[in-house]
Amino acid sequence: MKKRKLLVTTALPYANGSIHLGHMLEGVQTDIWVRYQKLAGNECYFFCADDTHGTPVMLAAKKENISPEQLVSKIHTEHYNDLTAFHIEYDNYYSTNSPENRFFSEEIYNSLKKNSHISEREIEQSYCDHDKMFLPDRFIKGICPKCGAKDQYGDGCEVCGSNYSPKDLIDSQCAICGNTPGLKKSKHLFFKLQDFQSELSSWIENPNHVHEGVRNKLNEWFSQGLQEWDISRDGPYFGFEIPGEVNKFFSWRTVFFFIAL
């Protein structure tokens, strides 16, 4: 029988808090499967890492009065010790805040920009005059504009699953000081997802590429037409700086997308 080459990972735990039961369950189940593959003689590598960038880490670090770098270092040690205490054996347990990740994020971005798949334009965003900063993602909370659920973040509703712009929140408040934000313009960078819609749409039709349920969901998005994706965040922000830009950072979702590539 031909030996298989396998690269295995689990969902990356976020670096703003402790491991929970769901992380541990997934880790143990995956470890059992990986051990079997190795015993069967397959070339199998088990990787995972802490998800470190973004506003939740910044907020958690601010509460502890330490830097984001100090927080992710402390949490990484805690996560690794907890997971390995359950005899979960990773070939590598790392961090998204790594020099390798920075290198490949910059390389992919520069390639996309060189081939005209990056655009830029000025957008209007929520801005806190008290804290002197823009309020992306979890720096702003309010009422969901889709379902009316209270206390929702600016990057999406945890009740109805809708995505929206932070400035669309109803009765929004800065997550740091609680004040009502205003609006301010800033230049942002966008990845032209629509440039790849035809190629992606054709690729998923192959039954060997994706599960039918995944294909159906993707076709829902394709039927609406892929839109440009905002890949930038204004400083202060904990993440990788965008090459050639001043005080602009890759959003944490962008870095994850580049990792997947």
Question: Predicted segment positions?
Answer:
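Short, charge-patterned binding micro-sites
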Residues: 50-56
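A non-catalytic, amphipathic alpha-helix used as a structural packing/dimerization or gating element
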Residues: 32, 70-81, 107
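A glycine-rich helix N-cap at a beta->alpha junction
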Residues: 77-91
